[in-house]
């Protein structure tokens, strides 16, 4: 797939800009806070309908504007599509494909696929478990857009169940037994939690099982085979096999075991929203004992594995978005990354200095100077 054009209106600090991409590699160069990351964020939204920087659309709209717009012309192997996201400071966003409005987000997801790698991704290793869950969920959404719908339903069920548990907590703490109506309501939400949670965890397990060997292979290449990376899925509800009935039963049993704790805390403590993903180098947990260099190598291996897996599943190479990541990698890891990319993936890269790239890369790339939300195509000799 190839992103041919991108149009931004009242998006972040862009008043109105359009760019036509003319090479497999585009380098966005400029000082900090000029809009380089904002452009990559727009592409990320087209791919996932989410931003890793905010969950509020009003923060995406230019100050003083009521709404903003992202439009793109995408060339795929057998089709061409015009994608459009209308963002509103207040109210729901509108999604269009070829000027036809999408009734569901599910219809829009999967049109464009992209993998983003930024300095924030180091939190994949050293951050809290929700960082790793969000990373895995974003990947699974691109592999199977239906997953976003299932996850959204699961999160809604957890929210409603939490509200019920919170209302029952005071009654439980006074020593009163739950009434028949309360017990029936909780049982109803239990069934929905188990049903949707089972669909989520089985997809997570299968997705990670496909990604893990790819990550291990890439890690071996980058590290020179000095360490072995093991990626493990550590679900809150454990089971053996892939039979949904087995997962169902394990889920119900753990809910029964944790009933008192849930009533005491007034919140749901069982389910995939408590899952973890583990990264182990040889026999050592990377999160607690890995050096900064080891952690960067691990994240780089994960990102290259994502690219490989998405390409295998969808049959086309996804876009690669590199947000100021070269500054976080030493020269050896930079070389490994740039060699892996070559011209196989359309790549958008942000940087403050072109000197981080060798001459061959600069000569073959489209270079855009970014200044205060304005784009200008430049030659390498005109910068740095």
Swiss-Prot record:
<comment type="similarity">
    <text>Belongs to the RecF family.</text>
</comment>
<comment type="function">
    <text>The RecF protein is involved in DNA metabolism; it is required for DNA replication. RecF binds preferentially to single-stranded, linear DNA. It also seems to bind ATP.</text>
</comment>
<keyword id="KW-0547">Nucleotide-binding</keyword>
<dbReference type="GO" id="GO:0005524">
    <property type="term" value="F:ATP binding"/>
</dbReference>
<dbReference type="GO" id="GO:0000731">
    <property type="term" value="P:DNA synthesis involved in DNA repair"/>
</dbReference>
<dbReference type="InterPro" id="IPR003395">
    <property type="entry name" value="RecF/RecN/SMC_N"/>
</dbReference>
<keyword id="KW-0067">ATP-binding</keyword>
<dbReference type="GO" id="GO:0006260">
    <property type="term" value="P:DNA replication"/>
</dbReference>
<dbReference type="GO" id="GO:0003697">
    <property type="term" value="F:single-stranded DNA binding"/>
</dbReference>
<keyword id="KW-0235">DNA replication</keyword>
<dbReference type="GO" id="GO:0006302">
    <property type="term" value="P:double-strand break repair"/>
</dbReference>
<dbReference type="InterPro" id="IPR001238">
    <property type="entry name" value="DNA-binding_RecF"/>
</dbReference>
<protein>
    <recommendedName>
        <fullName>DNA replication and repair protein RecF</fullName>
    </recommendedName>
</protein>
<dbReference type="InterPro" id="IPR042174">
    <property type="entry name" value="RecF_2"/>
</dbReference>
<dbReference type="InterPro" id="IPR018078">
    <property type="entry name" value="DNA-binding_RecF_CS"/>
</dbReference>
<dbReference type="InterPro" id="IPR027417">
    <property type="entry name" value="P-loop_NTPase"/>
</dbReference>
<dbReference type="GO" id="GO:0005737">
    <property type="term" value="C:cytoplasm"/>
</dbReference>
<dbReference type="GO" id="GO:0009432">
    <property type="term" value="P:SOS response"/>
</dbReference>
<feature type="binding site">
    <location>
        <begin position="30"/>
        <end position="37"/>
    </location>
    <ligand>
        <name>ATP</name>
    </ligand>
</feature>
<keyword id="KW-0963">Cytoplasm</keyword>
<dbReference type="Pfam" id="PF02463">
    <property type="entry name" value="SMC_N"/>
</dbReference>
<keyword id="KW-0238">DNA-binding</keyword>
């Amino acid at each position: 797939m190839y992103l041919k054009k991108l149009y931004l209106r009242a998006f972040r600090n862009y008043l109105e800009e359009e760019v036509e991409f003319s090479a497999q590699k585009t380098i966005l160069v400029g000082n900090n806070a000029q809009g380089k990351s904002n452009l990559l964020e727009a592409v990320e939204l087209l791919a996932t309908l989410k931003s890793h920087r905010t969950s509020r659309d009003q923060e995406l709209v230019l100050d003083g504007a009521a709404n903003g717009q992202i439009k793109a012309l995408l060339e795929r192997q057998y089709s061409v599509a015009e994608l459009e996201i209308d963002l509103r400071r207040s109210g729901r966003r509108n999604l269009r494909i070829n000027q036809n409005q999408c009734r569901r987000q599910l219809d829009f997801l999967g049109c464009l696929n992209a993998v983003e790698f930024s300095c924030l991704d180091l939190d994949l290793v050293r951050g809290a478990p929700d960082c790793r869950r969000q990373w895995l969920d974003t990947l699974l959404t691109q592999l199977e857009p239906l997953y976003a719908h299932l996850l959204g339903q699961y999160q809604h069920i957890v929210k409603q169940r939490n509200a019920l548990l919170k209302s029952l907590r005071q009654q439980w703490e006074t020593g009163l037994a739950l009434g028949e109506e309360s017990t029936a309501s909780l049982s109803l939400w239990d069934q929905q939690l188990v049903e949707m949670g089972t669909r989520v965890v089985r997809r997570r397990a299968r997705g990670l099982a496909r990604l893990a060997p790819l990550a291990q292979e890439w890690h071996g290449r980058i590290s020179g085979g000095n360490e072995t990376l093991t990626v493990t899925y550590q679900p809150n509800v454990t089971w053996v096999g892939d039979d949904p009935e087995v997962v169902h039963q394990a889920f119900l049993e753990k809910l029964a075991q944790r009933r008192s704790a849930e009533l005491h805390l007034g919140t749901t403590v069982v389910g995939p929203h408590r899952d973890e993903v583990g990264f182990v180098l040889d026999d050592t947990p990377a999160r607690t004992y890995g050096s900064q260099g080891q952690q960067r190598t691990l994240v780089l291996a994960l990102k290259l594995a994502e690219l490989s897996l998405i390409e295998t599943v969808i049959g086309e190479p996804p876009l690669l978005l590199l947000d100021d990541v070269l500054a976080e990698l030493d020269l050896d890891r930079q070389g490994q990354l740039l060699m892996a990319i070559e011209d196989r993936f359309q790549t958008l890269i942000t940087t403050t200095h072109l000197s981080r790239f060798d001459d061959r890369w600069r000569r073959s790339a489209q270079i855009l100077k970014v200044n205060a939300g304005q784009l200008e195509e430049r030659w390498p000799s005109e910068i740095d």
